[in-house]
Amino acid sequence: MSVTAQNLTLLTDLYELTMMQGYYKKGQHETVVFDVFYRHNPCGNGYSVCAGLDQVIDYIKNLNFTYEDVDYLRSLHIFDDDFLQYLSGFHFTGDIYAIPEGSVVFPKEPLLKVIAPIMEAQLVETTILNLINHQSLIATKTSRVVYAADGDGIMEFGLRRAQGPDAGLYGARAAIIGGCVGTSNVLAGQLFDVPVMGTHAHSWIMTFPDEYTAFKYYAELYPDNCTLLVDTYDTLKSGVPNAIRVFQEFKDAGKPLKKYGIRLDSGDLAYLSKKARKMLDEAGFPDASICASNDLDEYLLHDLKAQGAAINSWGVGTHLITSKDCPSFGGVYKLSAIKNENGEFIPKIKISENTEKITNPGNKTIYRVYEKETGKIKADLICFADETFDESQDLLLFDPLETWKKTKLAGGTYTMREMLIPIFKNGECIYTSPSVTEIAEYCKQEKDSLWDETKRLFYPHRVYVDLSQRLYDVKKALLDQAHKPE
């Protein structure tokens, strides 16, 4: 279900509009190419998960300046009446290409490409980055947490700690894409048609005369899904014994609980879970689940798994929904080509003293190269959009910075897949977005195409993003031209 049926046109940085007015006054209407990409995987990860495309689509569809928008801009006393009149009739007429949501992606490759008249392409920069950066960050962080859980279910529990309602809502969406099995966020469940999950709070226990009574009444209310929070008073002396007592009473009454277990929210989770597991098993409840929460992240999960914690379900909140240790994604939006009067795209390059900030010029696309035998990703290849490749021929891959690092793939041993697909054509959306659940399933398949060495939490193997020979030659020529001796 679409959420952003709202107009976000003014959700932009002021300088986008001041530049637009400058282009308008100069009569600049040429078509340009902008690329969205990032330079480093967040959290030291070996890959990222791109997300947020569906919200970009909604944003572009609803892009228009209302009377109130124009009136507000007039009140700033920055913009001339003729430019404001132009904005009154503004709508997006360009093309957008993007990598599908849920794809694994790597630094410096275009996640999204805008081809549009300069004023249109300039305006959409800020909001596209806002939408892609946030959800890609949370989807990537979630992937790390899911990896650390090693097959256990991860529930997204972060709404109350998110940086505002939008971050909570779209963070939950991104978390499902990244691999969470459900969310506590009821609005996210409604809007995105994803599973909602939860247990109860300590306050539930505290409002009853005693813990046993609270547990029993909760089990009577929810016999099909009953997880009892056992650490309000004393986990091993009170909480677990009272939970077992309730489970046994329902079993003896011929009404055994269908899906049931306990939740730990404090203390030494490894120690308590192993003790609780032993108590549950000895009481005849080996199928009772043990869920844990309490400021978890991928590192703590990794350690708890290594210590043999008897936990099979995890509620992860603050560290996931805020990506606490790596709170930004770093996506950028850079001009890469301008179309001339002959309809040809002239490559443009941004040069920097910092090598990693030098951009890749031209109207480009990306091909993912897979090892045919295993289906695993070998590399990504950035090339000009009009380049084609023959999988029956040898393919030379080389590092664009350390060009002596080369790999030749023999024809017939690899396959290639173009990653950028058309989303908008001449201002019209031509793409049908999959559901969030479908994106999550696709993301799981995408991660299966990664080597285990790339998925590990610590010092992951790098997936190379290479340039075609033609693109490399053009980039080198532009750099040589810019640094020509006087």
Model-derived features with residue positions:
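Buried, small/hydrophobic-residue-enriched core segments of structured protein domains
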Residues: 1-31, 40-42, 78-79, 84-93, ...
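Gly/Ser/Thr/Ala-enriched C-terminal appendages of enzymes
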Residues: 2-30, 43-45, 283, 288, ...
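N-terminal, Lys/Arg-enriched amphipathic/low-complexity engagement segments
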Residues: 28, 32-88
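An N-terminal, globular interaction/scaffold subdomain
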Residues: 58-63, 98-101, 105
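Short coil/turn segments at secondary-structure boundaries
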Residues: 71-72, 140-144, 158, 455-462
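Short acidic, Pro/Gly- and aromatic-enriched capping/linker segments at domain boundaries
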Residues: 96-102, 414-419
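Hydrophobic residues within beta-strands of alpha/beta enzymes
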Residues: 197, 262, 290, 312-314
